[in-house]
Amino acid sequence: MELTPRLAAVAALVPACHCMADIGTDHAYVPMDLVRKHRVEHAVASDIHKGPLDIARRHIGENRLSRWIETRLGGGLETLQPGECEGVVIAGMG
């Protein structure tokens, strides 16, 4: 899986860290890329809508990344505990 130029630019802005969150993940491409490249150890992929989150879960499972990427249903940063992730991506919403 290769990221689009826009998503690659977004991913390049995420610093190496233990945990990052992709809010409004849609398909989970950014967290999958960052985990594969060992830029993050763990990722949270969240979306407010079940349909896109189901797609993200499928992509994560097909790529055998479920051990490192957790999916959560919810809006915005409410899916995270305070201090849980050092980096957050909020891109392509709206």
Model-derived features: where do they sit?
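Conserved SAM/SAH-binding beta-strand->alpha-helix loop
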Residues: 49-51
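Conserved SAM-binding loop of SAM-dependent methyltransferases across substrates and taxa
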Residues: 27-40
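S-adenosyl-L-methionine
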Residues: 1-18, 32-33, 54-83
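Conserved SAM-binding motif I beta-strand of class I
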Residues: 42-47
